[in-house]
């Protein structure tokens, strides 16, 4: 079971979220049949969305769009405050580029572009916020977004590690944020600890990476666990939803589908589930329009 744990330092100067997103990213890889670099890029964006959604309340939905100029194309993810996230990468077949230590790089495949966050509070008029991609490695881009757009100094670490067959081995991350009222010496102490943290990939390799992340963030400093919540890859598509989408088409288009294709087949971009609509379904939609 994937989870996100929310914590706050005893002094109230900082808060931290730590995530285990292994099954989330594994499910995404299975559904989209992504290659190595596209798996890591999509996985990191899913984790980034889970972090942002954890910052929200109510029935808020967050869409993250990584709009890069390179071969991966767009990466789109949607997360809500109930722990659900879904997403896809435009070009899932982008393959591997590794460092000398075996780390999978995604920046060259993302390229230059924008990090766009759409926040929908469920009352209409979603709020859009855009910052430039500074590296294309997603974690650094999220930290820059939080610092620039939300004016909240933030440290972010997130990654997806693959096994020898390029299947998801482990995925997760953390967010640390300065809270109002933090003293300069507290900020300096935490900044030093973050700078001295082992690489996120090293922490994720630990037997209990959640505890390893918390230990790396807080050291010997006291903190409180505020909550532990389940997170998951979950798409909200349905036959009814796509039926409504077909209903928005002109009658002439529906008639053409009925006569030439004898139905319609729609595949959800977010989870690759296929929905079939027969001539009877199309006839019903045409009749409702008349």
UniProtKB/Swiss-Prot annotation:
GO terms for molecular function: protein folding chaperone; unfolded protein binding. GO terms for cellular component: cytoplasm. Disulfide bonds join 235-237, 268-271. Keywords: Chaperone, Cytoplasm, Disulfide bond, Redox-active center, Zinc. GO terms for biological process: protein refolding. It holds the Pfam family HSP33. InterPro entries: Heat_shock_Hsp33, Heat_shock_Hsp33_C, Heat_shock_Hsp33_N. Under oxidizing conditions two disulfide bonds are formed involving the reactive cysteines. Under reducing conditions zinc is bound to the reactive cysteines and the protein is inactive. It is found in: Cytoplasm. Belongs to the HSP33 family. Redox regulated molecular chaperone. Protects both thermally unfolding and oxidatively damaged proteins from irreversible aggregation. Plays an important role in the bacterial defense system toward oxidative stress. This is 33 kDa chaperonin. The gene is hslO.
